[in-house]
């Protein structure tokens, strides 16, 4: 499976993943809104928005 793995508004990059899901985490801090993308569907702390999906590059 292919997931996007670029940070925030960086140009799109992808990585091959062993599992069948991708994630997109979104949160805000003193730098503004931060977006992190990658493989799997991790546990997140309170205050972090998590979206998990199950198709190639679905987390862009």
From Swiss-Prot:
GO cellular component: extracellular region
Coiled coil ranges: none
One Pfam family here: Toxin_cobra-type
Keywords associated with the record: Acetylcholine receptor inhibiting toxin, Disulfide bond, Ion channel impairing toxin, Neurotoxin, Postsynaptic neurotoxin, Secreted, Toxin
Sequence intervals crossing the membrane: none
Cystines in this chain: 3-22, 17-39, 41-52, 53-58
InterPro entries: Snake_3FTx (IPR003571), Snake_toxin-like_sf (IPR045860), Snake_toxin_con_site (IPR018354), Toxin_cobra-type (IPR054131)
CDD domains named among the record's database cross-references: TFP_snake_toxin
Tissue specificity field: Expressed by the venom gland.
Localization per record: Secreted
Gene Ontology MF terms: acetylcholine receptor inhibitor activity; ion channel regulator activity; toxin activity
Function: Binds to muscle nicotinic acetylcholine receptor (nAChR) and inhibit acetylcholine from binding to the receptor, thereby impairing neuromuscular transmission.
Family listed: Belongs to the three-finger toxin family. Short-chain subfamily. Type I alpha-neurotoxin sub-subfamily.
Protein name listed in UniProt: Toxin aagardi
